[in-house]
């Protein structure tokens, strides 16, 4: 199976020592000029700067110092609660699996490490992948997700997911349908504030927009965390659509308060859509 190619970027300087693709705070062999330094402090005569040396009031030999490009950790924190079992135009877990496959492949090609934390009412070692450069690990994880039927009773473990990310700042993709209370989302985003968080919102138009006017429809019940059959009628259809519109506004308000609008996927996984999110 061919993995769709996607691209991402960060707007901050990485602090890691490992060479990679991203702008960094580290000195090294990159092409971006950082500053001048005395040769005794930066002993690389190949970068001797005659003009800076002549201007130096202390008559010290000056060399150019450059920034290296560094690698970063890239994580997916995934909601594995029961609402993620919804199947409409496509299964939400299939969309997540495609996204994980594309992101893990892109990360390892870029020189970044990819990790994964799956969350429901609790975290589980079964769904914990420490950040790794092993491309096969991401592909194997994606296939497991594709076959998985989530049954989690809540998304509460998202609150503690940051504990599994390590001490370095990471680019974190928070993947969920966010069918849980807005105050919990605000707490989750606050817990992840140290990291660069991209919310990935997996909705399906068959959940709300493309409901039939009449007929039997299987819907997810947020109170029982299970599915049930409803006899759809125009009034019920309108109420469901209004509820989704209110929820969408609440979610976007919380995301905006934390400085990042979501990457919305309503029509399945599209690698180009992910790339446009970062590069416009």
Label every model-predicted segment.
Residues 96-97, 151-155, 244:
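A conditional alpha-helix N-cap/helix-loop micro-motif detector
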Residues 1-25, 167-168, 180, 186-280:
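Von Willebrand factor type A / integrin I
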């Amino acid at each position: 199976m061919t993995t769709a190619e996607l691209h991402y970027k960060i707007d901050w300087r990485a602090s890691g020592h490992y060479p990679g693709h991203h702008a960094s705070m580290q000195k090294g062999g990159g092409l971006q000029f950082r500053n001048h330094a005395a040769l005794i402090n930066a002993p690389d005569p190949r970068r001797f700067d005659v003009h800076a040396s002549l201007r130096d009031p202390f008559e010290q030999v000056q060399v150019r110092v450059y920034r290296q490009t560094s690698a970063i950790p890239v994580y997916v924190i995934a909601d594995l609660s029961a609402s993620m079992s919804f199947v409409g135009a496509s299964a939400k877990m299939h969309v997540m699996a495609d996204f994980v496959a594309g992101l893990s492949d892109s990360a390892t090609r870029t020189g970044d490490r990819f990790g994964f934390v799956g969350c429901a009412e609790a975290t589980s070692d079964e769904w914990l992948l420490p950040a790794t450069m092993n491309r096969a690990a991401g592909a194997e994880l994606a296939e497991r997700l594709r076959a998985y039927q989530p049954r989690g009773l809540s998304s509460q473990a998202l609150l503690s997911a940051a504990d599994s990310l390590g001490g370095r700042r990471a680019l974190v993709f928070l993947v969920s349908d966010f069918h849980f209370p807005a105050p919990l989302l605000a707490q989750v985003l606050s817990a992840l504030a140290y990291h660069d968080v991209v919310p990935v919102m997996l909705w399906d138009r068959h959940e709300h927009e493309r409901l039939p006017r009449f007929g039997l429809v299987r819907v997810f019940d947020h109170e029982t965390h299970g599915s049930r059959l409803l006899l759809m009628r125009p009034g019920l259809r309108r109420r469901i659509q209004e509820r989704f519109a209110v929820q969408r506004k609440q979610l976007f308000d919380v995301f905006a308060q934390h400085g990042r609008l979501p990457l919305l996927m309503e029509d399945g996984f599209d690698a180009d859509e992910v790339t446009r999110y970062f590069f416009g």
